[in-house]
Amino acid sequence: MPKPYVAINMAELKNEPKTFEMFASVGPKVCMVTARHPGFVGFQNHIQIGILPFGNRYGGAKMDMTKESSTVRVLQYTFWKDWKDHEEMHRQNWSYLFRLCYSCASQMIWGPWEPIYEIIYANMPINTEMTDFTAVVGKKFAEGKPLDIPVISQPYGKRVVAFAEHSVIPGKEKQFEDAIVRTLEMLKKAPGFLGAMVLKEIGVSGIGSMQFGAKGFHQVLENPGSLEPDPNNVMYSVPEAKNTPQQYIVHVEWANTDALMFGMGRVLLYPELRQVHDEVLDTLVYGPYIRILNPMMEGTFWREYLNEQ
């Protein structure tokens, strides 16, 4: 079974209670409409809470900026058997999706923007609550299997994500991929490490980003939100919008912000790991720039699909 594709719908919204009320009310409706398509295998929706300062490289940043930032970034992951399933779902349910998303327009500062990625590396255990832990270990014991203690990756806002942006020098993609995978394998030993994956951008969804050419642009501005623009006015296909240089997201999950800060800090402080990560740095046009996310709303069954490989 192939690894799922990931569409990440990004938007910048006002940081105020109304935004979070909309996130809680509109988000579930969007997920239910999305679930109509059989190619949909799960979701993981985040808000950004801060930025990793990386020592003093980004000295104005903090691990938690939720109280002082005027905007909040929302990053909504959806997982698909094939990226074409994502596009088909949008077209089949466009009236519902447009009206739901447009209902949040009053809070919008930037977006939506929806790149699509293939997963080229994944070490993502299933999510478990503390109540599941004894059942998992007990089942292994009863079956006579080795008692490798699984990590407890708690869902629904109880962990954090390092969302690391990278742009790679053309021709150095393989060097980057090899070095970043070795880096992540070494990070496994850090306290609080809960899993990681490397996402390679394959393009951008025009319909998911509401990019409809001139005609659709004016339709969006001129209508009250009850009349959706024609989705066939999208001017490009997903692969045509692939960025150059190549874009990657390195998604690393941690038990809490302290684990994230000291864990990611190993690429600066642990000599052997630093040497490997330096090979990553030598391939970059841009990055690493690490946003800190909190997964607030999840359909964790995508992990079950991923781990069936």
UniProtKB/Swiss-Prot annotation:
Modification sites for Cysteine persulfide: C31
Taxonomy, superkingdom: Archaea
UniProt entry keywords in alphabetical sequence: Cytoplasm, Iron, Metal-binding, Oxidoreductase
Location, primary (coarse class): cytoplasm
Induction: Aerobically induced.
SUPFAM superfamilies membership: Dimeric alpha+beta barrel (SSF54909)
Cofactor: Fe cation
Cofactor remark: Binds 1 Fe cation per subunit.
EC numbers: 1.13.11.55
Alphabetical list of InterPro entries matching this protein: Dimeric_a/b-barrel, S_Oase_red
Gene Ontology CC: cytoplasm
Catalysis performed (reactions): 4 sulfur + O2 + 4 H2O = 2 hydrogen sulfide + 2 sulfite + 6 H(+)
Outcome recorded upon mutating H86A: No enzyme activity and no iron bound
Location in or out of the cell: Cytoplasm
Pfam families noted in UniProt: SOR
An annotated Gene Ontology molecular function: metal ion binding
Binding-site positions, Fe cation: H86, H90, E114
Impact noted for substituting E114A: No enzyme activity and no iron bound
Gene3D superfamilies: 3.30.70.100
Regulation: Inhibited by zinc.
Record function comment: Catalyzes the simultaneous oxidation and reduction of elemental sulfur in the presence of oxygen, with sulfite and hydrogen sulfide as products.
Assembly and binders: Homoicosatetramer. The resulting structure is a hollow sphere where catalysis takes place in the inside cavity.
Protein name: Sulfur oxygenase/reductase
Gene for this chain: sor
